[in-house]
Amino acid sequence: GYWSRGLGDVYKRQITDGVKFASTLGTIMPVFSSPLLQYMIKALPFSSIMKILLRHPRNDRKMIFAAMYFGNPSKKIPFMGVNNYVDEVIKLEKLFSDGRNFFYNTFSHVDINLMCVFNRLVDLGLEETVSHKTPHIYAYWEKLKSRNSYQNGILNYYTDKEKELLSEFYKNNDSSVLKAILEQIDKKL
């Protein structure tokens, strides 16, 4: 029953909802985003970090914030998602190879979610991963970018502060993760 599994199991299940670490596009994006997140955390004043450490409800997140502020764990984290990401890209490429315009043929929440995922790839300098040997995903992404909702709901959200932060991040960001992803795509396609 409920109590025989222990509260730790229940807590773990509530947080992960049964999804393994970096196993889906939705769980891989935070892994790929860790260098950007660390860049943003390091830009915070120490007092903000202390507020997070004192007030954040999740201890695991507190530890991540502290590690990113005082250390440099994000250099290796993105590589943990490369293989699963490439597998997900290949699945999408096969799905869109039937000529459909959207995930379910008509624009849906899945397309909105993928729009957000692909836009995050742009933010991270990884957009090439959805066009390298994947013409069907590339065509789909171009359709998504041409929608007014992309401009109004995503691009118009960025303020000058976000644009400046991303520009600074790009200056310090190496392309080793991009290279690793493209190499895996080359191997698997």
Per-range role (PLM):
Residues G8-V10, D111-I112, R147:
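Short, thiol/selenol-centered motifs that function as redox-active sites or metal-ligating centers
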Residues G1-Y11:
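Single conserved hydrophobic/aromatic residue that forms the stacking wall/gate
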Residues G18-E142:
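GST-like fold's C-terminal all-alpha helical module
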